[in-house]
């Protein structure tokens, strides 16, 4: 899956992965990240999610990373914000009070970019990637995060043979394999969500679960 794939999805407005509401799992479980006002949270592959503005409204400093320039521009335009724009290494950096978005390749992130991050929130990053990229993504995320970090991870699982992603099925054992080295993994929620996801029903998926994990690296 190349960068051109995602640029085309945004250019053609094929963004079914974008939610027009704050993610309810985030609202329920943000407190588990034990963040204080002013602390920084990373949102990888953030798109133009409404969660960015909601996190900032909770008093947090939000750092999003997104490949698509259109997604980043749309976010600020739709929130009537006028960001300061400059260059930070290989990233184009957009900044307003409480929110910084780095537009560019996630794999170009370096540890110094995340030095102030206490936690991360992944709702649409891991599940957006095919199997051959997920291990690389999880490995790079862990390599650049500070030593003591927490994470809130949302995944989906379904019979992958019944539908071509994205979003891709990420089973529990895969999550635990990616974060086996030094992370404590707690499953916070798991539930059947097929009935409220008509796109999966239309494509013949027989079951669909969503899971939420708290990750803590000690």
UniProtKB/Swiss-Prot annotation:
GO terms for biological process: methylation; response to metal ion. It holds the Pfam family TPMT. GO terms for cellular component: cytoplasm. It is an enzyme of class 2 (transferase). Keywords: Cytoplasm, Methyltransferase, S-adenosyl-L-methionine, Transferase. Its main location: cytoplasm. It is found in: Cytoplasm. One of its GO terms (molecular function) is thiopurine S-methyltransferase activity. Its EC number is 2.1.1.67. S-adenosyl-L-methionine binds at residues 10, 45, 66, 123. It catalyses: S-adenosyl-L-methionine + a thiopurine = S-adenosyl-L-homocysteine + a thiopurine S-methylether. HAMAP family: Thiopur_methtran. Belongs to the class I-like SAM-binding methyltransferase superfamily. TPMT family. NCBIfam families: PRK13255.1 (NF009732), TMPT_Se_Te (TIGR03840). This is Thiopurine S-methyltransferase. It comes from Pseudomonas aeruginosa (strain UCBPP-PA14).
């Amino acid at each position: 899956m190349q960068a051109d794939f995602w640029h085309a999805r945004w250019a053609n407005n094929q963004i079914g992965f974008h939610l027009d509401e704050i993610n309810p799992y985030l609202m329920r479980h943000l407190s588990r990240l034990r963040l204080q006002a002013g602390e920084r949270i990373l949102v990888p592959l953030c798109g133009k999610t409404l969660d960015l503005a909601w996190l900032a409204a909770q008093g947090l400093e939000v750092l999003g990373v997104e490949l698509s320039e259109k997604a980043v521009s749309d976010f600020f335009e739709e929130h009537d914000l006028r960001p300061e724009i400059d260059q930070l290494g290989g990233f184009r950096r957009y900044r307003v009070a409480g929110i910084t978005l780095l537009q560019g390749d996630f794999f170009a992130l370096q540890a110094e970019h995340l030095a102030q991050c206490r936690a991360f929130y992944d709702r649409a990053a891991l599940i957006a990637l095919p199997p051959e990229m997920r291990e690389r993504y999880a490995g790079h995320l862990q390599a650049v995060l500070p030593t003591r970090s927490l994470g809130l991870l949302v995944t989906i699982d379904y019979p992958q043979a019944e539908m071509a992603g994205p979003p891709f099925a990420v089973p529990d054992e895969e999550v635990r394999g990616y974060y086996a080295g030094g992370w404590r993994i707690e499953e916070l929620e798991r539930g059947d969500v097929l009935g409220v996801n008509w796109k999966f029903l239309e494509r013949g998926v027989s079951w669909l679960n969503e899971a939420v994990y708290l990750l803590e690296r000690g």
